[in-house]
Structures are given as C-alpha cells and as structure tokens.
Regions:
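Hydrophobic, secondary-structure "cap" segments at the distal end of domains
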Residues: 160-170
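Receiver (REC) domain switch/active-site residues of two-component response regulators
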Residues: 132, 193-194
Length: 241
C-alpha cells in the first residue's frame, strides 16, 4: 500500500492514509486555538476544490475533519472579524459566504466525519453540523455549543437550520438561546453526536468508526449517493440566506 501523502497551508493540513481516508486538520500556527478567520475559510474553500477532484478520481473514500490542537477543536469564528463588519449588508455577505463553504462539505460525494476532541464552539459546531457523522472524545474539555447569543448575535453559518433536524426543535432552541455548551454524553443522547470514544485512543477509535462507515456504504455507487443527497436537500428546509 502507498504511504500517506500530505499537504499543508498556513492553517490547514491534509493527508490521505493507506485506507484512502482523507484527514483534514485545522491547526492555526499563530494561535493556541483554532478560529475560523476569513483567511482560513478561504484556504478551506480552495482545499475543498482539490478534494472534490480527488474524490471524483476515486482517490479518497471518506473525509475526517479534526483539530491539531490538543484538547481544543474549533473555538468559533473570528470575533475580531465579526466586530469589523461595518454594516448589515457586510454581515449578510459574510454569513452567506460561510454557509456556501460549509455546504461544499455537506455535498462531498464521500462520507464526512467530524472528530471532536476538545471544545467545539460557534462556527466549529456549525462546521460539524454539515458533516455526515460526528464522533467526540470523552476528554473533560470536550463540549459542543453555540454561544453566539452571549455576544448578541445568532449563528450565521447555518446552525439554526442544521441543528433542529438532528436534535429536535426543543433541544435546538435550548442550545441556541441559552448559549450553554453540551457535554458529549448528552450530545449523544439527543442525537448531536453519533459516538463518544476514549480520548486516550481517539485517532484509532475514529479510524475504526470510519472503517465501519465505509464498509456499510461500499456497495453504493457515487451516482446513487448524489441522487440521495439532492433528494434530501429538496425535502429539508433551505439554508438561511
């Protein structure tokens, strides 16, 4: 088998392992935590174009999104960038751009798995909501939330639309309107997380989960997956514009 191949940008890393699983790593070198800065979002958009091509060529069977920061997944959007928005039109444009990029993840023609080991907040939570599956570690620092309301704003990258179908309207309203984070155990009970695994063997546990996903879907041809995705998009509410 071929050895893993890797590529990197200033905020993202990417490698493909011997099982044809892509590992997309968020790891800002200039910060102790990951935030979704405008630059990082641009890099993600560009990397997704490369991924779409490699997926179409049959080089990648599944994609894992993870953090390179121990004990922290993604802290959210860039607060300074939000504060710099000077008008409602600018805010709408920034929100629409984030939604567009996250929808590209949602529409990838391979299973996508968010591997959450540590705090996952705001835009990080909205990111994982656009993945097919979510696996979280049992680390003490692992929490998932949408704290935007505490800043006087609402989730802008699709969280208000993506969360209710997963956890039900009552649970979704509680998470969005309180801004309080959810621990992995409760997240699994309400359907926000698919699996909680030991932090001590997180990568191997995620690999096992992904192998199971690939095994369950190996008989499905890409055109069938694409048709199913388009059908679901028509049935579910449209993204907030």
């Amino acid at each position: 088998m071929n050895a893993p191949t890797s590529e990197s940008t200033s905020g993202l890393g990417f490698e493909v392992d011997r099982d044809h699983v892509g590992w997309l790593t968020f790891d800002r070198p200039d910060s102790s935590v990951n935030t979704l800065t405008p630059l990082l979002m641009q890099e993600l958009d560009a990397l997704l174009s490369q991924l779409e091509s490699r997926i179409a060529n049959g080089q990648i069977f599944a994609l894992v999104l993870r953090s390179g920061k121990e004990g922290s997944f993604i802290a959210g959007a860039d607060v300074e960038a939000i504060a710099a928005l000077s008008s409602a039109a600018d805010a709408r444009a920034a929100s629409a751009e984030g939604q567009r990029i996250f929808r590209r993840i949602e529409r990838l023609r391979v299973p996508t798995v968010a591997a959450v080991d540590g705090a996952c907040m705001g835009g990080g939570t909205e990111l994982i909501l656009h993945c097919d599956y979510r696996v979280a570690s049992d680390r003490n620092s692992t929490v998932i939330g949408l704290p935007e309301v505490r800043l006087g704003i609402l989730p802008g990258f699709g969280g208000t639309v993506k969360l209710p179908p997963l956890v039900g309207m009552q649970n979704a309203l509680g998470i969005i309107l309180s801004g309080k984070p959810v621990r992995p155990s409760r997240a699994k009970r309400i359907g926000l997380i698919d699996e909680v695994v030991a932090a001590a063997r997180f990568r191997s546990a995620v690999s096992e989960f992904v192998a199971g996903v690939i095994g369950n879907r190996v008989e499905r041809a890409p055109p069938t997956l694409g048709f199913g995705q388009r059908l679901l998009e028509r049935m579910l509410p449209a993204q907030v514009q």
